[in-house]
């Protein structure tokens, strides 16, 4: 009977290890698909608030992207499409 218990407990360990590895893959995928650090949405909102003090902008016309170029260099890119003020 102890021989069967040995195989059963080993199978549970393997199942637990497999579940842990799958969960780590899912978490890593979710982190990479977010596209940026946790502070990026708040940074975007703060930048919008400051820019709105000076010009009228549409929040849907703004993109904020953080690109990691190397271990020491990240580039924050902010693109704003301003409304055309021309009347006519």
Swiss-Prot record:
Keyword Protease among record annotations: no
Keyword vocabulary terms for this entry: Cell cycle, Cell division
Keyword Transport: no
Entry superkingdom: Bacteria
Any one of the GO BP annotations: regulation of division septum assembly
Pfam family, one: MinE
HAMAP family recorded: MinE (MF_00262)
Recorded family membership: Belongs to the MinE family.
General function of this protein: Prevents the cell division inhibition by proteins MinC and MinD at internal division sites while permitting inhibition at polar sites. This ensures cell division at the proper site by restricting the formation of a division septum at the midpoint of the long axis of the cell.
Protein's name according to its UniProt entry: Cell division topological specificity factor
Organism: Aeromonas salmonicida (strain A449)
Gene behind the chain: minE
């Amino acid at each position: 009977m102890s021989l069967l218990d040995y195989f059963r407990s080993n199978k549970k360990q393997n199942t637990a290890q497999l579940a842990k590895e799958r969960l780590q893959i899912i978490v890593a995928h979710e982190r990479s698909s977010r596209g940026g650090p946790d502070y990026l949405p708040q940074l975007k909102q703060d930048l919008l608030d400051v820019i709105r003090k000076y010009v009228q902008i549409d929040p849907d016309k703004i993109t904020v992207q953080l690109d990691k170029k190397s271990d020491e260099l990240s580039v924050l890119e902010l693109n704003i499409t301003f409304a055309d003020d021309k009347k006519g």
